[in-house]
Amino acid sequence: MIDQKIFETTLNIDDPANFCTNVEAHLLKELENIYVGKCFKNSFILNITGVIQRSPCFIMRTNNSGRGYMHVRFSALVSCLNAFDLIAAVKIIKNDSNIILGESLLTEPVTIVIPSSESQNNVAEVGQIVPVQLANSSVYYIPGRQQASATGSIFIPKHTFSVYHVQEELTQEQALNLTKLVNIIEMLLESRSKKDFKQICFFEKLYYTYSINSDEILDLKIWKGPKGKEMARLKPCNVLSFLYDALKNKSSSLGFWARPPDLFKSSPLAYQQDQNSFNTTELPIICSAEVMFVTLLKEIINYLQFMNDLCDTFNNEQLIKRHENIWMLIEQKKI
């Protein structure tokens, strides 16, 4: 995910006299030279956006070098990969009995290790582009490196889901804090609306948990879901509309929330019910309304970006056909 972050650091200054002739210009240049295009504090820095605070230039008195140093707080545009993130385009650069390596074509530079011990991963050939889900706690940002490293597997639709039990109402202030994530979703939806609808249908159907036919899709624009798959007696809730109502104190977040497999994962939909009747063996996760909505919104963002990236990457029929072995693998894993 692209984000803004604030960092603190101490810069060593080789020529304090020259540096202080134009501190702002020299400081920005120094920050760019050291950090842009490199890993730093669990992020990959794309651009320095500003200096927030700086100390005077201090002279080192422990030696006779004449060098100086300065404490700096700065903001930067960064890319951050997290556990379980989806990457739509990972190009396989090595595949042998010991290891499978891939490089992301869409995110910041990252090398992804794909375990060859998992048989599903061995279908990918060198040069092919595969969709990957990162493993848990698998992203490593080593300071100063020009790329991150991670572990992941070819992404297969998931059958499991979590149920969240919310026992306190979402406040207006909390709903306001969620508008940043809502805005990202709306931006991704706008981008999606400009893509080829046939491509969207292909990948939505491919990554739907159940096996379905094209004519079973009712309306992917609002993600009602395939015929016969809707949960009985339940009507899905549009999370975005719900949060806009929450800003006006016109909605209640109490109860049990979930996004089970009958919903398209890139949809802004979820189910809410008073009593837990979701078909899962896992116990409900008790959490605040804010934590639950952050979790749901980030999942929606992840899947929406994933679907948009798939459409952008596999943008012609020939490229899609060259990867039929990957699509067949995904279809075989469905319920």
Curated annotation (Swiss-Prot):
Protein name (database record) = DNA-directed RNA polymerase RPB7 homolog
Q: Indicate yes or no for the key word Transcription.
A: yes
The reply to whether Transcription regulation figures as a keyword in the UniProt entry is no
Source species: African swine fever virus (isolate Tick/Malawi/Lil 20-1/1983) (ASFV)
Location(s) in or outside the cell? Host cytoplasm; Virion
Which cellular component appears as one GO term in the record? host cell cytoplasm
Q: Kindly report the protein's main subcellular placement as a broad class.
A: host cell
Q: Which family does it belong to?
A: Belongs to the Asfivirus DNA-directed RNA polymerase RPB7 homolog family.
